[in-house]
Amino acid sequence: MMNKHIFYYLMVGSMALLLGACNDSMNDLLEPKVYFESKEYNFSVEDEMDVMTFDLVSRLSSATSSQVDVSYSVAEPSVVDEYNAKYGTNYEMLDVSQVKLSSTTSSISSGKLYADNIEVELSGLEALKAGNSYVLPMRVHSSSVSTLSGTNIAYFFFSKPLKITKAGNFSNHYISVKFPVGTFFSSFTYEALINVDYFLDNNTIMGTEGVMILRIGDAGGGITPKDYLEVAGGQNYRVTKPLLTNRWYHVALTYDQPTGKTGIYVNGEKWAGSDWGIDGFDPNSDMGFYIGRIYGFKWGERPFHGKMSEVRVWSVARTENQLKQNMLGVDPASEGLALYYKLDGSETQEGGVIKDATGRIN
Protein backbone atom coordinates (compact mmCIF):
# COMPACT_ATOMS: atom_id res chain seq x y z
CA MET A 1 0.00 0.00 0.00
CA MET A 2 2.85 2.40 0.84
CA ASN A 3 4.40 1.79 -2.59
CA LYS A 4 1.11 2.75 -4.23
CA HIS A 5 0.98 5.96 -2.20
CA ILE A 6 4.57 6.77 -3.15
CA PHE A 7 3.75 6.19 -6.84
CA TYR A 8 0.65 8.36 -6.52
CA TYR A 9 2.57 11.22 -4.93
CA LEU A 10 5.31 10.92 -7.54
CA MET A 11 2.73 11.03 -10.33
CA VAL A 12 0.95 14.04 -8.81
CA GLY A 13 4.29 15.76 -8.31
CA SER A 14 5.28 15.14 -11.93
CA MET A 15 1.97 16.46 -13.18
CA ALA A 16 2.42 19.58 -11.05
CA LEU A 17 5.87 20.13 -12.52
CA LEU A 18 4.53 19.68 -16.05
CA LEU A 19 1.65 22.07 -15.39
CA GLY A 20 4.10 24.56 -13.94
CA ALA A 21 6.31 24.29 -17.01
CA CYS A 22 3.30 24.73 -19.30
CA ASN A 23 2.21 27.79 -17.34
CA ASP A 24 5.70 29.26 -17.61
CA SER A 25 5.69 28.70 -21.38
CA MET A 26 2.22 30.20 -21.70
CA ASN A 27 3.21 33.20 -19.60
CA ASP A 28 6.29 33.67 -21.75
CA LEU A 29 4.16 33.62 -24.90
CA LEU A 30 1.72 36.17 -23.46
CA GLU A 31 4.44 38.48 -22.12
CA PRO A 32 4.74 41.69 -24.17
CA LYS A 33 7.86 41.76 -26.35
CA VAL A 34 9.41 44.40 -28.57
CA TYR A 35 10.36 43.68 -32.19
CA PHE A 36 10.53 45.01 -35.76
CA GLU A 37 7.32 44.45 -37.69
CA SER A 38 9.27 43.61 -40.86
CA LYS A 39 12.71 42.03 -40.97
CA GLU A 40 13.77 43.30 -44.40
CA TYR A 41 13.47 46.62 -46.21
CA ASN A 42 14.76 47.42 -49.70
CA PHE A 43 15.96 50.77 -51.05
CA SER A 44 17.28 51.79 -54.46
CA VAL A 45 20.07 54.37 -54.46
CA GLU A 46 19.68 56.58 -57.52
CA ASP A 47 22.54 58.24 -59.39
CA GLU A 48 24.07 61.28 -57.69
CA MET A 49 22.23 60.48 -54.45
CA ASP A 50 24.71 60.90 -51.60
CA VAL A 51 22.35 61.18 -48.61
CA MET A 52 19.21 59.22 -47.78
CA THR A 53 16.88 59.29 -44.77
CA PHE A 54 14.23 56.86 -43.57
CA ASP A 55 12.22 56.24 -40.41
CA LEU A 56 13.00 53.49 -37.92
CA VAL A 57 10.22 52.16 -35.70
CA SER A 58 9.70 49.13 -33.48
CA ARG A 59 6.56 47.80 -31.84
CA LEU A 60 5.17 45.70 -29.00
CA SER A 61 3.44 42.35 -29.39
CA SER A 62 0.76 43.61 -26.96
CA ALA A 63 0.08 46.90 -25.22
CA THR A 64 1.27 47.54 -21.65
CA SER A 65 -0.07 49.71 -18.83
CA SER A 66 3.20 51.61 -18.53
CA GLN A 67 5.64 53.28 -20.91
CA VAL A 68 8.21 51.03 -22.60
CA ASP A 69 11.60 52.49 -23.44
CA VAL A 70 13.52 51.18 -26.45
CA SER A 71 16.94 51.89 -27.93
CA TYR A 72 18.60 51.18 -31.27
CA SER A 73 22.11 50.35 -32.42
CA VAL A 74 23.84 49.20 -35.57
CA ALA A 75 24.27 45.43 -35.24
CA GLU A 76 27.72 43.88 -35.32
CA PRO A 77 29.30 42.75 -38.64
CA SER A 78 29.00 39.08 -37.64
CA VAL A 79 25.23 39.42 -38.10
CA VAL A 80 25.81 40.13 -41.80
CA ASP A 81 28.27 37.24 -42.07
CA GLU A 82 25.66 34.89 -40.59
CA TYR A 83 22.97 36.21 -42.96
CA ASN A 84 25.21 35.73 -46.00
CA ALA A 85 26.14 32.20 -44.91
CA LYS A 86 22.50 31.27 -44.31
CA TYR A 87 21.07 32.63 -47.57
CA GLY A 88 24.02 32.29 -49.94
CA THR A 89 24.37 36.05 -50.42
CA ASN A 90 27.33 38.44 -50.30
CA TYR A 91 25.90 41.68 -48.92
CA GLU A 92 28.45 44.27 -47.88
CA MET A 93 27.76 46.05 -44.62
CA LEU A 94 27.59 49.84 -44.70
CA ASP A 95 30.24 51.51 -42.59
CA VAL A 96 29.00 52.69 -39.20
CA SER A 97 30.49 56.12 -39.97
CA GLN A 98 27.86 56.50 -42.72
CA VAL A 99 24.99 56.11 -40.22
CA LYS A 100 23.51 58.91 -38.11
CA LEU A 101 20.44 58.47 -35.87
CA SER A 102 18.29 61.43 -34.83
CA SER A 103 18.19 59.65 -31.46
CA THR A 104 19.31 56.26 -30.21
CA THR A 105 16.28 55.99 -27.91
CA SER A 106 12.52 56.12 -28.24
CA SER A 107 9.47 55.11 -26.24
CA ILE A 108 6.15 53.35 -26.56
CA SER A 109 3.41 55.08 -24.56
CA SER A 110 1.16 53.07 -22.26
CA GLY A 111 -1.67 51.44 -24.16
CA LYS A 112 0.12 51.93 -27.49
CA LEU A 113 1.86 49.41 -29.75
CA TYR A 114 4.32 51.48 -31.80
CA ALA A 115 7.35 53.46 -30.71
CA ASP A 116 7.83 57.05 -31.77
CA ASN A 117 9.76 57.22 -35.05
CA ILE A 118 13.42 58.10 -35.15
CA GLU A 119 15.17 59.18 -38.34
CA VAL A 120 18.13 57.33 -39.83
CA GLU A 121 20.40 59.35 -42.12
CA LEU A 122 22.87 57.62 -44.43
CA SER A 123 25.67 59.51 -46.15
CA GLY A 124 28.44 58.72 -48.61
CA LEU A 125 26.08 56.78 -50.88
CA GLU A 126 27.64 58.09 -54.09
CA ALA A 127 30.59 55.82 -53.35
CA LEU A 128 28.42 52.68 -53.54
CA LYS A 129 29.19 50.57 -56.59
CA ALA A 130 26.45 49.97 -59.16
CA GLY A 131 25.37 46.34 -59.15
CA ASN A 132 26.70 45.66 -55.66
CA SER A 133 24.35 45.09 -52.75
CA TYR A 134 24.73 46.60 -49.30
CA VAL A 135 23.01 46.13 -45.96
CA LEU A 136 22.57 48.01 -42.69
CA PRO A 137 21.48 45.73 -39.81
CA MET A 138 19.73 47.59 -36.95
CA ARG A 139 19.08 46.04 -33.54
CA VAL A 140 16.34 47.04 -31.07
CA HIS A 141 16.88 46.80 -27.28
CA SER A 142 14.70 47.39 -24.24
CA SER A 143 15.29 47.29 -20.50
CA SER A 144 11.53 47.32 -19.91
CA VAL A 145 10.50 44.17 -21.80
CA SER A 146 12.14 41.29 -23.65
CA THR A 147 12.86 41.38 -27.36
CA LEU A 148 11.23 38.88 -29.70
CA SER A 149 13.96 36.54 -30.91
CA GLY A 150 14.42 36.47 -34.67
CA THR A 151 12.79 39.86 -35.24
CA ASN A 152 14.92 42.06 -33.01
CA ILE A 153 17.19 42.83 -35.98
CA ALA A 154 15.95 44.57 -39.14
CA TYR A 155 17.96 44.45 -42.37
CA PHE A 156 17.94 47.50 -44.62
CA PHE A 157 19.19 46.61 -48.11
CA PHE A 158 20.57 49.12 -50.61
CA SER A 159 21.54 48.77 -54.26
CA LYS A 160 22.33 50.97 -57.24
CA PRO A 161 20.68 50.35 -60.63
CA LEU A 162 22.62 48.29 -63.15
CA LYS A 163 25.00 50.19 -65.41
CA ILE A 164 26.25 48.31 -68.44
CA THR A 165 28.84 50.23 -70.44
CA LYS A 166 30.20 47.39 -72.59
CA ALA A 167 28.29 44.46 -74.05
CA GLY A 168 28.15 42.07 -76.98
CA ASN A 169 26.07 43.15 -79.98
CA PHE A 170 24.01 40.21 -81.25
CA SER A 171 22.06 41.86 -84.07
CA ASN A 172 24.11 40.00 -86.68
CA HIS A 173 26.12 37.68 -84.48
CA TYR A 174 25.72 34.48 -82.49
CA ILE A 175 27.79 32.07 -80.40
CA SER A 176 27.78 28.33 -81.01
CA VAL A 177 28.82 26.37 -77.91
CA LYS A 178 30.24 22.86 -77.84
CA PHE A 179 30.18 21.54 -74.29
CA PRO A 180 32.57 18.70 -73.38
CA VAL A 181 31.42 15.33 -74.70
CA GLY A 182 29.19 13.60 -72.18
CA THR A 183 27.89 16.82 -70.61
CA PHE A 184 24.45 16.29 -69.08
CA PHE A 185 22.67 18.89 -66.99
CA SER A 186 20.38 17.43 -64.33
CA SER A 187 19.86 20.72 -62.53
CA PHE A 188 20.87 23.89 -64.37
CA THR A 189 20.69 27.67 -64.64
CA TYR A 190 20.78 29.95 -67.68
CA GLU A 191 21.36 33.64 -66.99
CA ALA A 192 22.26 36.78 -68.92
CA LEU A 193 21.98 40.54 -68.99
CA ILE A 194 19.98 41.52 -72.07
CA ASN A 195 18.90 44.73 -73.79
CA VAL A 196 16.55 44.34 -76.77
CA ASP A 197 16.73 46.81 -79.66
CA TYR A 198 13.52 45.51 -81.23
CA PHE A 199 11.44 42.33 -81.09
CA LEU A 200 10.92 39.85 -83.89
CA ASP A 201 8.31 37.11 -83.58
CA ASN A 202 10.87 34.82 -81.93
CA ASN A 203 14.08 36.00 -80.24
CA THR A 204 16.71 33.49 -79.07
CA ILE A 205 18.57 34.18 -75.84
CA MET A 206 20.26 30.81 -75.33
CA GLY A 207 19.76 27.09 -75.26
CA THR A 208 19.35 23.91 -77.27
CA GLU A 209 16.57 24.21 -79.85
CA GLY A 210 13.83 21.62 -79.43
CA VAL A 211 15.26 20.55 -76.08
CA MET A 212 15.72 23.42 -73.62
CA ILE A 213 15.80 27.01 -74.83
CA LEU A 214 15.20 30.39 -73.21
CA ARG A 215 13.79 32.90 -75.67
CA ILE A 216 11.46 35.85 -76.06
CA GLY A 217 8.22 35.28 -77.95
CA ASP A 218 6.73 32.76 -80.32
CA ALA A 219 4.32 35.12 -82.08
CA GLY A 220 4.76 33.36 -85.40
CA GLY A 221 3.41 30.20 -83.85
CA GLY A 222 0.50 32.13 -82.39
CA ILE A 223 1.44 30.98 -78.89
CA THR A 224 3.52 33.57 -77.05
CA PRO A 225 3.55 37.36 -77.66
CA LYS A 226 6.84 38.51 -79.18
CA ASP A 227 7.90 40.41 -76.03
CA TYR A 228 7.22 37.67 -73.44
CA LEU A 229 9.97 35.47 -71.98
CA GLU A 230 9.36 31.76 -72.36
CA VAL A 231 10.98 28.35 -72.04
CA ALA A 232 10.56 26.11 -75.06
CA GLY A 233 11.63 22.67 -76.24
CA GLY A 234 10.75 19.55 -74.30
CA GLN A 235 9.13 21.73 -71.63
CA ASN A 236 7.17 24.95 -72.07
CA TYR A 237 5.90 27.83 -69.98
CA ARG A 238 6.08 31.62 -70.09
CA VAL A 239 5.82 34.80 -68.05
CA THR A 240 2.66 36.89 -67.87
CA LYS A 241 3.99 40.37 -68.65
CA PRO A 242 6.16 41.86 -71.39
CA LEU A 243 9.72 43.09 -71.54
CA LEU A 244 10.50 46.53 -72.95
CA THR A 245 13.01 47.57 -75.59
CA ASN A 246 16.12 49.63 -74.81
CA ARG A 247 16.19 48.55 -71.18
CA TRP A 248 18.65 46.29 -69.38
CA TYR A 249 17.26 43.19 -67.69
CA HIS A 250 18.88 40.32 -65.88
CA VAL A 251 17.02 37.18 -66.98
CA ALA A 252 17.44 33.65 -65.68
CA LEU A 253 15.97 30.18 -66.00
CA THR A 254 16.56 27.63 -63.24
CA TYR A 255 15.71 23.96 -62.75
CA ASP A 256 16.33 21.99 -59.56
CA GLN A 257 16.06 18.33 -60.53
CA PRO A 258 15.62 16.84 -57.02
CA THR A 259 12.55 18.99 -56.33
CA GLY A 260 11.35 19.41 -59.93
CA LYS A 261 10.99 23.16 -59.38
CA THR A 262 11.76 25.55 -62.24
CA GLY A 263 11.51 29.32 -62.44
CA ILE A 264 11.97 32.25 -64.81
CA TYR A 265 13.49 35.27 -63.07
CA VAL A 266 13.78 38.90 -64.14
CA ASN A 267 16.13 41.14 -62.16
CA GLY A 268 16.20 38.52 -59.45
CA GLU A 269 12.42 38.36 -59.06
CA LYS A 270 10.44 35.25 -59.97
CA TRP A 271 8.10 36.03 -62.86
CA ALA A 272 6.89 32.49 -63.54
CA GLY A 273 7.40 28.92 -62.37
CA SER A 274 6.43 25.33 -63.03
CA ASP A 275 7.02 21.75 -61.92
CA TRP A 276 8.91 19.35 -64.16
CA GLY A 277 9.64 15.67 -63.85
CA ILE A 278 12.60 15.43 -66.20
CA ASP A 279 16.01 13.90 -65.53
CA GLY A 280 17.78 16.75 -67.32
CA PHE A 281 19.15 17.25 -70.83
CA ASP A 282 22.20 17.05 -73.07
CA PRO A 283 23.07 20.58 -74.28
CA ASN A 284 24.94 19.17 -77.30
CA SER A 285 21.89 17.29 -78.61
CA ASP A 286 19.72 18.18 -81.62
CA MET A 287 21.03 21.43 -83.20
CA GLY A 288 23.43 22.04 -80.33
CA PHE A 289 23.66 24.98 -77.93
CA TYR A 290 23.42 28.52 -79.31
CA ILE A 291 23.42 32.05 -77.93
CA GLY A 292 21.68 34.83 -79.86
CA ARG A 293 20.59 32.82 -82.92
CA ILE A 294 19.91 29.19 -83.95
CA TYR A 295 22.28 29.12 -86.89
CA GLY A 296 21.13 26.98 -89.82
CA PHE A 297 17.78 26.00 -88.28
CA LYS A 298 15.43 25.09 -91.11
CA TRP A 299 12.39 26.72 -89.49
CA GLY A 300 14.17 30.04 -89.07
CA GLU A 301 17.24 31.14 -87.15
CA ARG A 302 15.26 33.32 -84.71
CA PRO A 303 17.91 36.01 -84.08
CA PHE A 304 18.12 38.21 -81.03
CA HIS A 305 18.44 41.89 -81.99
CA GLY A 306 20.11 43.67 -79.12
CA LYS A 307 22.94 43.42 -76.64
CA MET A 308 23.95 40.79 -74.09
CA SER A 309 26.46 40.56 -71.27
CA GLU A 310 27.28 38.19 -68.39
CA VAL A 311 26.02 35.11 -70.23
CA ARG A 312 26.33 32.04 -67.99
CA VAL A 313 25.27 28.42 -67.79
CA TRP A 314 25.46 26.50 -64.52
CA SER A 315 25.14 22.82 -63.70
CA VAL A 316 23.23 23.76 -60.53
CA ALA A 317 20.02 25.64 -59.80
CA ARG A 318 21.05 29.05 -58.55
CA THR A 319 18.91 30.50 -55.75
CA GLU A 320 16.95 33.72 -56.00
CA ASN A 321 19.42 35.43 -53.67
CA GLN A 322 22.39 34.22 -55.71
CA LEU A 323 20.81 35.59 -58.88
CA LYS A 324 20.19 38.97 -57.26
CA GLN A 325 23.65 39.17 -55.77
CA ASN A 326 25.73 38.32 -58.83
CA MET A 327 24.14 40.03 -61.82
CA LEU A 328 27.26 41.96 -62.80
CA GLY A 329 29.85 39.25 -62.36
CA VAL A 330 30.96 36.01 -60.73
CA ASP A 331 34.26 34.28 -60.11
CA PRO A 332 35.03 32.18 -63.24
CA ALA A 333 36.18 29.41 -60.89
CA SER A 334 32.78 29.27 -59.12
CA GLU A 335 31.58 25.75 -58.41
CA GLY A 336 28.98 24.59 -60.94
CA LEU A 337 29.77 27.29 -63.52
CA ALA A 338 29.85 25.46 -66.85
CA LEU A 339 29.97 28.41 -69.29
CA TYR A 340 30.77 32.11 -68.87
CA TYR A 341 30.98 34.90 -71.43
CA LYS A 342 31.33 38.34 -69.84
CA LEU A 343 31.05 40.03 -73.27
CA ASP A 344 32.58 43.23 -71.94
CA GLY A 345 35.56 43.30 -74.27
CA SER A 346 37.79 41.35 -71.89
CA GLU A 347 37.53 38.03 -73.76
CA THR A 348 40.18 36.86 -76.18
CA GLN A 349 39.24 35.73 -79.69
CA GLU A 350 41.12 33.45 -82.04
CA GLY A 351 39.95 32.77 -85.58
CA GLY A 352 36.45 34.04 -84.89
CA VAL A 353 36.18 31.90 -81.73
CA ILE A 354 35.52 33.69 -78.45
CA LYS A 355 37.12 32.17 -75.37
CA ASP A 356 34.94 31.12 -72.45
CA ALA A 357 36.05 32.61 -69.10
CA THR A 358 35.88 29.27 -67.25
CA GLY A 359 38.38 27.64 -69.60
CA ARG A 360 36.14 24.58 -69.83
CA ILE A 361 34.84 25.22 -73.34
CA ASN A 362 37.22 24.57 -76.24
Each language-model region and where it sits:
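Extended recognition patches within non-cytosolic domains
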Residues: 310-362
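Bacterial Sec-dependent N-terminal signal peptides
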Residues: 2-7, 12-50, 151-162
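Extracellular glycan-interaction surfaces
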Residues: 160-169, 195-199, 215-278
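Extracellular/lumenal carbohydrate-interaction signature centered on repeated Trp-anchored short motifs
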Residues: 178-190, 240-249, 280-282, 301-307, ...
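Extracellular glycan-interaction patches encoded by glycine-rich segments
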Residues: 285-309, 321-329
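Short hydrophobic/aromatic patches on beta-strands that form ligand-binding or substrate-lining surfaces
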Residues: 188-198, 251-253, 291, 311-313, ...
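Short glycine/proline/serine/threonine-rich loop/turn segments at secondary-structure transition edges
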Residues: 126-135
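Extracellular glycan-recognition modules
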Residues: 162-227, 318-322
